[in-house]
């Protein structure tokens, strides 16, 4: 699955942003407001967040080590053979991609001072493609990603901030006629998938759940014969 990475400068007017100092809080607010104004002011089709640099570095390191995985998405209950309602799940295949580290926008002298401990160089920008597992199995590299997450690292060295942008793929009819209409994924599902990415790729704490998610990620890559899809379902529900 190949995508064309859109530069951050094509989304935010960095020249205007550089006209005066901005704090991380101000940039985060601008990022949120921009995406809330999309799709005729509904914000549909996009999700966004601001990620501290140290958090991103941890996730990126895990993504480089384990660049693919599958995460469960809860679905409406269905009846089993006995007529009992049973929770259903849909699996999504995710793939990390890593791109050239962006240069720090100039003139950097006009930026507010970066947080203590922030590196003088930017990390790599990264993307995560999420596709229904059945779609990926049937079409592999030609499969259509339903959600594309991009972690923009342009402001990492100046503000210790990573800007996350999620783009939900519109349906064919929507793309042709009404871009703000229908999408292959709901806003709620896009948020849940993003949360699942964080749960499996950002290890923190010492709980059994954290250890098991770590073990599942390792088994998926290193010992696939020990990997059990059923174990993923324990981590499907939002916290």
What are these regions (language model features)?
Residues 1-96:
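Charge-rich, low-complexity N-terminal segments
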Residues 65-233:
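Extended amphipathic alpha-helical regions
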Residues 235-239:
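Long, charged/polar, low-complexity intrinsically disordered N-terminal extensions
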């Amino acid at each position: 699955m190949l995508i064309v990475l859109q530069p951050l400068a094509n989304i935010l007017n960095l020249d205007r942003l550089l006209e005066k100092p901005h704090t991380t809080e101000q940039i985060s607010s601008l990022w949120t407001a921009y995406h809330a104004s999309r799709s005729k002011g509904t914000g549909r089709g996009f999700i966004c967040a601001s990620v501290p640099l140290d958090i991103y570095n941890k996730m990126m390191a895990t993504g480089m080590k384990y660049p693919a995985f599958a995460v469960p998405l809860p679905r409406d209950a269905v009846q089993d053979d006995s007529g009992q309602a049973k929770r259903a799940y849909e699996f999504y295949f995710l793939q990390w991609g890593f791109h050239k580290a962006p240069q720090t926008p100039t003139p950097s002298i006009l930026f507010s001072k970066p947080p203590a401990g922030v590196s003088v160089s930017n990390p790599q920008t990264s993307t995560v493609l999420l596709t229904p597992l059945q779609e990926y199995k049937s079409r592999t590299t030609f499969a259509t990603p339903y959600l594309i997450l991009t972690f923009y690292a342009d402001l990492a060295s100046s503000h210790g901030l990573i800007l996350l942008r999620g783009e939900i793929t519109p349906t064919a009819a929507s793309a042709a006629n009404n871009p703000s209409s229908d999408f292959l994924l709901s806003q709620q599902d896009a948020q849940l998938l993003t949360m699942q990415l964080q749960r499996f790729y950002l290890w923190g704490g010492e709980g059994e759940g954290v250890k098991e998610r770590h073990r599942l990620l390792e088994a998926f890559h290193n010992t696939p014969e020990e990997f059990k899809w059923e174990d993923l379902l324990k981590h499907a529900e939002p916290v």
